[in-house]
């Protein structure tokens, strides 16, 4: 897959409602200005932006554009997210010395470029990929191993570098596979304020740079982050930052990344709190922007601590400017962005993830098989909001088992959204196979699905669209899908969404459209009719599966929380049902391995954060 997106504009606005008949909300730029009361003052610019992994030149261009914007806002200190220069996560690119050296060279070039463009006096903090300068092996890694690093650029030079101290090695994170940890407590003195610097996990884990910031008597703790989205994580993040600010004893700024990378979504939601844990600024979710704050912070101490502090971290102090700025009047324009409710947040994450995957991989259009059911209808609505209805192509592929209402529901969806639509019956191909092979039962059912998959891939090859797979988490968990049939595609937008949430999101999307005076995109019949694959007469999903509320509750315990069979039964679920569902999950691992990537929105999706053997003799028993 090749291609490169167009250069990002300096202040893009989100477009969650692009598509026929859907008017996007008014664009807005995030510029928040706050004063706390006290001296000296510091205007901090937090650039909550997107990056594309591997596009070092494009990411550097973005840093320059947003630095220019920050300078226009009068910033005194500018910050960008974790590994913004390389994108995050870089995975095994970190093991390629050529990529590491390209990152290091780009950092030096960026420092010179910022100075050439007139921003040399403006200190810029950003993340990049570095390597250890140590001549000795460390933590079982050879000398010169990669580092997840941050840097301060000033006057055309790389003034200060530091590496992430706490390395996450859980869920989707494999940072111990790639990086060696940092052992310094970087403190930058700028305009008479000591600013302690941290990177993401340095806040999420106890110890390390948070207590070290207190020991160093910092006035501000600035953490640059690339922490992926999960449902309900925003509340956890807020409480974390509040707690760490109190532990550090200083104002704490948590700068987040925004955008998508393969299966991960970054939701923004940057936060600044005072030393007492009170929130003074919170940025929008899923939106690029620049948060500008006028902060009154404690003056740096003349005899500030030096040497080794908490967790063996050595204070690494760099003085840029001792003298405070002349007093100026701080303007308050607003500080707390509106929060999204749970359904809108989840839907927005799915839109951002899909849009990022399509655009960052150089595609401009998507192709979806439309059955008239709720899964393909929700995927179509997401696609219209992500890339615009004019770039969405839907194909209905009815068989002799397809109901009239399903065919009609697919056409109605196309009419409501304005997507491109065609109907191609599979009967001639199906009859040819049946005449040749005489298939019956499940083989006959799956043949229909595989013919549809073949047709979608043929159209994709001919017309250049990327195929979207409509499978949901409930179906993938129990293997209720057909390999090389409904599982074909390059991306699965609802791969990590349980069926019960599919219904809720569809209802929310329609309700949101109605509240805006727009046409609800999803036909009501697609939401209310019993789910069915329609591969045999009268078929409905509950012929093969428990009711979805029960199924999803069992799956949430087994898949998301790793509960055993005894624990699930003790929670009130029938032992025979639990045994059956768990066996279906275990024996479907080989199918899930062949499913395309898709947006991760839960704490544990079917991807890097759930790794089980295919050949596996272990079975849960009650």
Regions found by a protein language model. Give the residues of each.
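Ala/Thr-enriched low-complexity intrinsically disordered regions
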Residues: 2, 7, 11, 20-23, ...
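Enzyme catalytic cores with a strong preference for nitrogen-chemistry domains
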Residues: 28-369, 385-386, 421
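ATP/NTP-dependent adenylation/nucleotidyl-transfer catalytic domains that generate, transfer
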Residues: 40, 249-250, 275, 299-371, ...
